[in-house]
Amino acid sequence: MSAFDDAIAAPVEKDTVADLRVLDSKKRGAEARAADEVAKAVLLGRFRHNPGLGWLEWEGRRWDGGEVATDRVHETVRQFVDEVERNYRAEVAEQAATGALIVDEIEQQVPKERRTKDDGKPMKPGDVVQAFGTKEQKAAFDKAADAAQAANTQAEIWLNLLTAGHVASVAKLCRGMDGILTRAAEFDAHPDLLNCRNGVVDLRTGQLQPHDPELLITKLAGAAYDPTARSQLWDQALSAVHPDALEWFQIRMGQSITGHTPDDDAIVVSVGGGENGKTGVTVGIMRACGTYGRLISHRILIAHPGQHPTELMDLRGLRFALMEETPEEGRLNTHQLKMTIGTPQITARKMRHDDITFDTTHTLLVNTNHQPIVDATDHGTWRRLKALPWPYTFLPPGVTPTKENERVGDRTLKPRLDTDEGVAAAALAWLVNGAVKWYAAGRISPADPAPVVEATALWRRVSDVGLRFAQENLIADPDRYITADVLRAQFNATLEAQGKHTWSAQTINERFSASLLAAGIPVKGTPKKPTKILDHHRESQPDPEPPPNGVPRPSSVRHLDSPAAAEKTAAKKTARVWMGVRFLTRAEKRQRDADPDRTLHAVAGE
């Protein structure tokens, strides 16, 4: 009882919290038992944990994660353990004070000389009570002593937990508890909602509702939502968009802030040289999106041999994904295009981590001065690409516009778009309005306006060498055909003249049908398998090149409708040919070049 005797004279230290948490007196399982108490007292409702995302903290508007959240969990655990330990120390002091009062009562009734031991030293408080106290006083004193001893034991146990290692262990044990452990799929699982600084917007209606931790939203837009917000700077930025494409662009960008992928699996590629205003518009959109938007690496879509696929992880949970300035001569990775656009889930991994699979939520906008090269000819690739031209060039101050597409520029616009408080709010209102329109149309994007159709067709014609060859050299004709060898020879000769790699027979057989179809030539047979040659079918071959200076020269390409060649092919009855197509004659090419708007029609027997 000597420890209690020593504590009787100590002052009582009161703490703001009187809560006491009892752990095993033998210190067995102290961390696990402490974790239960910590989770219930200070973590539930404030913190969540997911193995892939780590700790997240509710900050009043969203669940915020990262290393800071982990540090805050550890500090919260440390403060709680420290507070409980100090409460037990205060309990020891309070019980000691109770014992001191009992001793004082006895000492007032017993003379000092009687409270002295044989060796002349004063008796200890406990000995005084046992020697002179009443039955009631002894019972009260023993009760206080037992309580103090128990509190002191608990204080020692909790004090032992006040090390970095124990605090981290307690926090780790809390991660798997109900109400804290959360599946990744539960976060940001409301694609129709947008978390703004003043509440949560239902993008289907534009209505605002209060923030709610039960929604488990981790993202936050860059402004408060006000449907009436306007900004002269934002209106000035939007004036750079082609007027015939402005509403289309608004609805497209409105769809991009939802958690739904584009209904047509498309990406918008903003095309145009420098000083055309597209960067200013995307600055406003990115500011409005806040953490819902992100600038992503062009390596996601531009082929780089041997690259590590970690960039795809940037798309996890993202809504508006912006890719700025693809490299000149960059070649579009069509495989990754199909992996990232129009697929319900994406599999990726962080460096030195295992693969994970997550739902696709993003919409991609590409800003580029140089259109990526697209080697693919298939419809599946080109249906995903929409080129948005930015028609104007904004000139430096003092330079007078001389062309129809030139405008007087404002060099202060972009920095002001980047800093003005009203721009983010106005851009957010514009985006939400576009989203509401998209939902009102049944979540169907509007038809592409003429500028987009024309720019995309031009891009495809430039990129698709097969399409360009077909448009310049071929025409549909149901009764004509071109043998596989002849078409390959002519096509590869064209590629060689352009300094491009030639195609193998297999590549032509696999890809040229899509080019023909895009050129409006729906062939009825391809060299993939033999086609039956009927009596009325006639072989087509290119016109021979005119001899230089009238001097004939040999040619490895057979002349148009060579009787011997036609008879040889017809005798086979089946052959590997392109059926339903023929070469344009030189006369037809001259006619087309003289009147580009006139449509050429194939005439049987021509």
Where are these regions (language model features)?
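Amphipathic alpha-helical packing elements
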Residues: 55-58, 208
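Trp- and S/T/G-rich repeat-edge/linker motifs of beta-rich repeat architectures
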Residues: 57, 62-80, 84
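GGW-centered surface loops in extracellular recognition modules
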Residues: 50-54
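N-terminal acidic, proline/glycine-rich, low-complexity intrinsically disordered segments
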Residues: 1-10
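Feature primarily recognizes SF3-like P-loop helicase cores of small DNA viruses
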Residues: 10-49, 97-606
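Compact, glycine/acidic-enriched structural inserts
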Residues: 87-94
